[in-house]
Amino acid sequence: MEPDIVEGDILDQNVEVIVNSWNRNIIPWWLLLPQGVSGAIKKRGGLEPFRQVAKFGPIPLGGARLTSSGKLPYKAIIHVAGINMFWFATEYSVSQSVINAMKIINEKSFRSVAFPIIGSGSGNRGKQWSERIMLAAFETVDSEAEVSLVRYRKIS
């Protein structure tokens, strides 16, 4: 499958579900200062999604977990373990994050989802590298859902 590539803010996308590039969930969430997509979710959506994801315990690298969207207008948030213990994204962590998030999308029959560029922020990989890995992973997935890959751009 091939996602639509859009520019903007993931929290402004008209979709049922958004993906949050998270960590392996080993450090307690309340000790972290979320940045990027996670920081925006915390600011606009509140703490509830992070409390819920914490209850899952450690997430395997590239794993995905489904939570509510807190105060955000989505049906859910899928948190993916896009970075390893050293806060670095790998080809494996990024591609498995895409594949495992799409498994949840398909299992729950969500019709639309927006992904950030996993691994390009806290994962310390460039946007082009991360996007290339994600697009290759999407090619291995079959889905009826509409998928957007959001290149962050602040819109005034």
Regions found by a protein language model. Name each.
Residues 72-85:
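Short, basic/glycine-rich phosphate-binding loops at helix/coil junctions
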Residues 49-74:
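N-terminal short beta-loop-beta anion/metal-coordinating cradle
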Residues 16, 75, 111:
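Conserved acidic residues
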Residues 10-57:
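Short, conserved "active-site rim" segments that organize catalytic pockets and cofactor/ligand binding
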